[in-house]
Amino acid sequence: MNATPHTPLLDKVRIPADLRALDESELPQLASELRLELVDAVSRTGGHLGAGLGVVELTVALHYVFNTPDDRLIWDVGHQAYPHKILTGRRDRIRTLRQEGGLSGFTRRAESEYDPFGAAHSSTSISAGLGMAAARDLSGGRNNVIAVIGDGAMSAGMAYEAMNNAGALDARLIVILNDNDMSIAPPTGAMSAYLARLASGKAYAGLRDFGKKLTSYLGKRADRAITRAVEHARGYVTGGTLFEELGFYHIGPIDGHNLEHLIPVLKNVRDNGEGPVLIHVVTQKGKGYAPAEAAADKYHGVNKFDVITGAQAKAPANAPAYTKVFAESLIREAREDDRIVAVTAAMPSGTGLDLFGEVFPSRTFDVGIAEQHAVTFAAGLATEGYKPFAAIYSTFLQRAYDQVVHDVAIQKLPVRFPIDRAGFVGADGATHCGAFDTTFLASLPGFVVMAAADEAELRHMVRTAAAYDDGPIAFRYPRGNGVGVDMPERGEVLELGKGRVVREGSKVALLSFGTRLQDCLIAAEELGAAGLSTTVADARFAKPLDEDLIRRLARSHEVLVTVEEGAIGGFASHVLQFLAHEGLLESGLKVRPLVLPDVFTDHAKPEKMYADAGLDAAGIVRTVFTALDHTARAQRA
C-alpha cells in the first residue's frame, strides 16, 4: 500500500474558513498538497480522477475568495468535486469515496452544507444557481451564487436555457466555465490575464454603469446606441461572444492553474456585485499527475491504481462485458446492413460505440451531452429509412422522455434503444441507477421492451432490434460482465413477445425479466432440494408479454414469483394486470413480484445491493417459502 502523502499545510485546513486564514502566498503549496491527497485517495478507492486534478487551483481560489457555505458554490455533474470535499470537512472520509456507507462520488445536499445542490447528471448547475439567486433576491440577501460548469456540459441545451433566463432577469449570478478540453479558446499568457483583470475590474464596470445612467437620462431612443458603444468597448477588451448575446458579462479566457491570475479576477467579480457574469477558465484534465495528463480519457474514471506507475487494478474477467457484446454484435449486423447507424450522447466508450465508430466512422454520431436531441435526431434518421441505434444509459434516457413519447412512439418510428447500465450500478449510486426504463417505456403503446438474461441473449436482441421495423424497440442490459454462456457467432431473430422455459417444474414458477435469471436457477436448485419442484422461465419481453407462457405458469403452479431489475410499475405490473384480466388470480395462485426497492438506493457493490433488495438467490428462496407459509424455513434461509 502507498504511504500517505506529506501534507503539512493541508493538515491545517479542515474547512474553508481555515483556508481563508492562510496567506495568499501559501496557496500554491496548499494546491500542491491537495493534489497529492487527491491522487492518493482515489488510488485506494477508484473514482473520477482527471476532472478533480484539473480544478485543484480553481477550487482553492473559489473557497479563498468566496464565503462558503453562505456563498453558494455549485459544481456541475460533480466528477470534479473531490478537492472540494477535502477542503469542506470531509477529508477524514475521503478514502471512503463511493464505498458502502462512505462519501458519494458526487455533490450531495444530505452530505454537507457546502453542497447546496446535488449533482451527477450534467448541465443543471446554472438553472439551480439561478433559482438560488432569485430566492436570494426575493429574500433581500446579498450572498453570491457561483456555478462551475465544464465545456462538455455546455453542449446541453439546458445550460443555454438557464443562461438565456439569467440574462433576461439580469440576475447576479457567477458562472465559471471550466474549459478543460481547450475546445473553446486557449488563454494567451500574460496579456490574457491582464485583459481579464481589466474587464473584471471597477474601471470597466464604471463604464457600464455610466452607460446605463446615460440611457436613463436621455431616454430609450439613446439606449441602442449607448448599448452598442459599451458592448464595443467590452468586445475590444474581451472579444465578443455568444455569452454576451445571452446577457452575460464575459471575462477570459484565463489560466485556471495560475492562482495569481484567478484570485484577482474572482475578487473583482465578487466586489462588483453585478451580474450575470461568466468567467472562462482553461484547465488541463489530470493536471499534476503524469499518467493522467498523458491519457486523460483513461483517467477520467479509474479503478484502484498504483500511484507510482499509474497502473490500474482490474480483476480478470471470465466472460465478456455486456457493453462489448453489444458493440461487437451491432458491428456484426452493420456489416450486413448499411442502413444501421449508431447515436450516442457523449458516451462513446461507455456505450461501446467507440468500437462501432472505429469500423463505421461515417455511420457513428456523437451528438454531445444532449439526450433530447439524440432521440429526435435518431427519429429523423428513421424517417429516411435508416436503422438508428440510440445507445443511452438507462439513467440518462430519463432526460429525453418527452422525445421518446412525442417524437418516436406517437409516430411509430423504428428507433432502436440499447439501454446500458440497467439495474443497480454500484459505486455511482442512486443518480445512475437504471431503475425506471421498463416502467416508463412499457407503458407506451406500440413500444417493444426486452431485457437480456445473459450475453448470448443480448446478441439475439441486437439482431432482433435490427430486423424490427414496425416501431420503436428497446433492450436493456446491465453494467459489468456476462455469465460465461456459449456465444453464437451471430444472434437469432427472436419471435416477438415470446419467452422461454429454461427449467421445468410443477410447484413453483420463477419468471425472470433480465439477468436475475442466474439467481433464479440457483434458487430453483435450493428449492428442489427442499422438495419444491421449480420451473424457471426467461420472459425476454415486458411488452408484448408472452401471454401463453404466463397463462401456463399460472395454471400449473401454486406459486409464481416474478423477478426483475427495475422499479415498481414495470414488468411485474404488466404480468399482474394480465393475470387479473384473465381471472387467474381467483384460483388461489400466490403471486409475489420482486422489484427494486421503492427508494433511491445509496452506493455499494451491486451484489450487496441486490442481496439487500431480496433479488439474489437467497432472497428468491425466502420469498417462495414465505408465500407457502413455510415460516421456519423462511427464517433459516
UniProtKB/Swiss-Prot annotation:
Annotated positions binding Mg(2+): 151, 180
PROSITE patterns found in the cross-reference section: TRANSKETOLASE_1 (PS00801), TRANSKETOLASE_2 (PS00802)
Known cofactor(s): Mg(2+); thiamine diphosphate
Molecular-function annotations in GO: 1-deoxy-D-xylulose-5-phosphate synthase activity; magnesium ion binding; thiamine pyrophosphate binding
Pathway stated in the Swiss-Prot or TrEMBL entry: Metabolic intermediate biosynthesis; 1-deoxy-D-xylulose 5-phosphate biosynthesis; 1-deoxy-D-xylulose 5-phosphate from D-glyceraldehyde 3-phosphate and pyruvate: step 1/1
GO term, biological process aspect, one: thiamine biosynthetic process
Record-linked SUPFAM superfamilies: Thiamin diphosphate-binding fold (THDP-binding), TK C-terminal domain-like
Keywords: Isoprene biosynthesis, Magnesium, Metal-binding, Thiamine biosynthesis, Thiamine pyrophosphate, Transferase
Assigned EC number: 2.2.1.7
InterPro entries: Dxylulose-5-P_synthase, THDP-binding, Transketo_C/PFOR_II, Transketolase-like_Pyr-bd, Transketolase_BS, Transketolase_C, Transketolase_CS
Reactions this protein catalyses: D-glyceraldehyde 3-phosphate + pyruvate + H(+) = 1-deoxy-D-xylulose 5-phosphate + CO2
Cofactor remark: Binds 1 Mg(2+) ion per subunit.
Annotated residues for binding of thiamine diphosphate: 79, 120-122, 152-153, 180, 289, 371
Highest rank taxon of the organism: Bacteria
Similarity annotation: Belongs to the transketolase family. DXPS subfamily.
Entries under NCBIfam families matching the protein: dxs (TIGR00204), PRK05444.2-2 (NF003933)
Self-association state and partner proteins as the record states: Homodimer.
UniProt function note: Catalyzes the acyloin condensation reaction between C atoms 2 and 3 of pyruvate and glyceraldehyde 3-phosphate to yield 1-deoxy-D-xylulose-5-phosphate (DXP).
Name the UniProt record assigns to this protein: 1-deoxy-D-xylulose-5-phosphate synthase
Gene: dxs
